Amino acid sequence: VVGEGRGALGGAATMLRSLLLHSLRLCAQTASCLVLFPRFLGTAFMLWLLDFLCIRKHLLGRRRRGQPEIEVELNSDGEEVPPDDPPVCVSDDNRLCTLASLRAVWHGQKLDFFKQAHEGGPAPNSEVVLPDGFQNQHILDYARGNRPLVLNFGSCTUPPFMARMSAFQRLVTKYQRDVDFLIIYIEEAHPSDGWVTTDSPYSIPQHRSLEDRVSAARVLQQGAPECALVLDTMTNSSSSAYGAYFERLYIIQSGTIMYQGGRGPDGYQVSELRTWLERYDEQLHGPQPRRV
């Protein structure tokens, strides 16, 4: 009888502990939603305003005028090199405030709020998948010694990510002797069965399987053949750990996050990555003479 009583008490204690943990998680999620909601409402209101074409053209035009003048860079053949961060264009026929867009915005803001990665902190060693053979690996498997590792999260249906891929590829070509680069293909930013935009260069539905994700990644790989590419898992473990949706840049060195770029589209700046790499290159090899 005593043994049965102790067993019953132990079972009750386990249930009570489980209930307490669930309650704490629920309270934490509720508190985070209360913190995120004002930010989400502000973004939703801005998207609603941008659906008025006169406001959209005024705000986007003012943003372009407010950007600093870009110094023209020439390649070895004397041809002008496109800018690192071409302005984000939004076609007039795109609606920005829809149920699909609000879901995507909430998803991105929630991932950013709960992310494990923070500049100056340890880099999450989240799981990724090789496109060939679907072998599971981890992000830090691609870090070699003290060499910086650049992480570039994105997808084919994200217009800013694709528009800046050529600039990213130029940095890969220029700095790959001292720096490693890794593209992580994540869930689609603008899937054809979700938040659709006519500015997306490709029409790709949401990934239902790793086979879907690798098919989309193959398209991207054609434009970045010199850079290693892996897939995020179907549970989006890397995108969640790094708050990378819609797109994002990171630099890891010796297991520490040395640079955390802003969340796309506005915070995704290849020019910031270039500045960091230039400074790192100067530390290694001294300042390079500027071409006149």
Swiss-Prot record:
Keywords: Cell membrane, Endosome, Membrane, Oxidoreductase, Selenocysteine, Signal-anchor, Thyroid hormones biosynthesis, Transmembrane, Transmembrane helix. GO terms for biological process: hormone biosynthetic process; thyroid hormone catabolic process. Residues 51-292 are extracellular. Its EC number is 1.21.99.3. The keyword Lyase does not apply. Gene3D superfamilies: Glutaredoxin. The active site is at 158. One of its GO terms (molecular function) is thyroxine 5'-deiodinase activity. Its main location: membrane. It is a single-pass type II membrane protein. Residues 1-30 are cytoplasmic. It is found in: Cell membrane; Endosome membrane. The keyword Transcription does not apply. The chain crosses the membrane at residues 31-50. Pfam families: T4_deiodinase. It is an enzyme of class 1 (oxidoreductase). It catalyses: 3,3',5'-triiodo-L-thyronine + iodide + A + H(+) = L-thyroxine + AH2; 3,3'-diiodo-L-thyronine + iodide + A + H(+) = 3,3',5-triiodo-L-thyronine + AH2; 3-iodo-L-thyronine + iodide + A + H(+) = 3,5-diiodo-L-thyronine + AH2; L-thyronine + iodide + A + H(+) = 3-iodo-L-thyronine + AH2. GO terms for cellular component: endosome membrane; plasma membrane. It comes from the Eukaryota. Belongs to the iodothyronine deiodinase family. Monomer. Homodimer. May undergo minor heretodimerization with DIO1 and DIO2. Plays a crucial role in the metabolism of thyroid hormones (TH) and has specific roles in TH activation and inactivation by deiodination.Catalyzes the deiodination of L-thyroxine (T4) to 3,3',5'-triiodothyronine (rT3), 3,5,3'-triiodothyronine (T3) to 3,3'-diiodothyronine (3,3'-T2), 3,5-diiodothyronine (3,5-T2) to 3-monoiodothyronine (3-T1), rT3 to 3',5'-diiodothyronine (3',5'-T2) and 3,3'-T2 to 3'-monoiodothyronine (3'-T1) via inner-ring deiodination (IRD). Catalyzes the deiodination of 3-T1 to L-thyronine (T0) via outer-ring deiodination (ORD). This is Thyroxine 5-deiodinase. It comes from Ovis aries. The gene is DIO3.
